[in-house]
Each structure stands twice: as C-alpha cells, then as structure tokens.
Regions:
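Flexible, glycine/small-residue-enriched loop-and-beta-strand segment within the central core
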Residues: 24, 35-161, 166-174
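Terminal amphipathic alpha-helical/low-complexity segments used for targeting or macromolecular assembly
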Residues: 1-26, 32
Length: 177
C-alpha cells in the first residue's frame, strides 16, 4: 500500500499511452496493474491509488481522490467519481461516488451507488441503485432499533452489512440501513 510505504516504486510509466492521465503526479500505480485503452484517470481532485494486480477495463473513468484495492477490477465504462475507496478483490461497475466498498464485494453491472457503505462479501445484483438525496433536499433520517435518528446529512445512501445480497433491479431508498 502506497500510503504505508512511500518508498515503493510507482509503475505509472508503464501505462499505455492510450490511457488519459490528468494530474499524473497524483496517480500511483502498483505492480502488475492492467489499465486498458480509453481509461481516464483524473487526479485533479485528489490522488488516485491503484494497488497491485488491479485490472481496469476499457473506457472506465476514475476521479480522485480514489483508492482501488489489490486485485480489484473496475469494469468497462464504469464511472468512479470522487471520494471512493474500494477494498481488495472487488468488482465494480456502473456509477459510484463518495462510497466505501469493503473487501470481496461486487457491483459489477450498471446502476448507481452513492454516499454509501458496502460491507465485505456483498453482492449487488445488476442495475442495483440507491437514492442518496431526498426530493425535498431535507436532512435524512434513518431508523435504528425502531427509533428515528436525524443524520444531519443531506446526502446519505445505502449502508449494507457483510454477506448481504441484492437481486437485479433493486432500488434502495435514501438512507437505507
């Protein structure tokens, strides 16, 4: 991990010229990373760290700050926006912003996940989406132990625990726990 050991070699110079690098001094690539043609790595908003053995399929767009864990895969056409952390051995596609994916979780297909926490070993079926903003722009309230709690946040998506699954076309409401 580059945050723990800054003396590791950055393999960014081995990236194919068909990959678009924006603010490349803020892009850090580990060993044996594959980045296919047409990928955009935009670190103008913060660093992008891609750990060892990750695989980025063609035409994915990744904006920093972002961390992609060891042996994870970012699928073709994915849009990974700012403030995303993806653990090791994950498969992520579709649109993702301001979210955390813990290790071994999958969201391979189309759909939106935003302002969310995805536990370990979670599988989100094709076209799973979450809302992260109420239509009236009010603060989000969630239910915990049969009690309504005001989060104080205008944006809050899905919080899904370890080993959870969703089927295809699942829609999660704003602030779903």
């Amino acid at each position: 991990n580059y945050l723990k050991n800054s003396s590791k070699e950055n393999y960014i110079e081995k990236i194919d010229s068909s990959v678009h690098l924006i603010n490349n001094q803020n892009i850090f690539v580990g060993e044996n990373v594959t980045i296919k043609p047409g990928v955009v790595l935009d670190a103008s908003g913060g660093p992008i760290i891609i750990d060892n053995n990750a695989f980025i399929y063609p035409n994915a767009v990744i904006e920093g700050p972002c961390f992609i864990g060891e042996s994870s895969k970012i699928k073709s056409g994915a849009a990974i926006y700012e403030n995303v952390s993806i653990g090791k051995v994950c498969k992520v596609g579709g649109e993702v912003e301001q979210s955390i994916f813990m290790d071994y979780s999958n969201k391979q297909h189309a759909g939106f996940i935003g302002h969310s926490y995805i536990g370990s070993w979670v599988n989100l079926g094709a076209d799973t989406n979450n809302s992260d903003l109420k239509n009236n722009y009010s603060k989000i309230k969630i239910k915990l132990s049969n009690k309504e709690v005001d989060t104080g946040s205008q944006f809050l998506g899905l919080m899904i625990g370890d080993h959870s699954k969703s089927s295809i076309n699942t829609m999660f409401n704003t602030g779903t726990v």
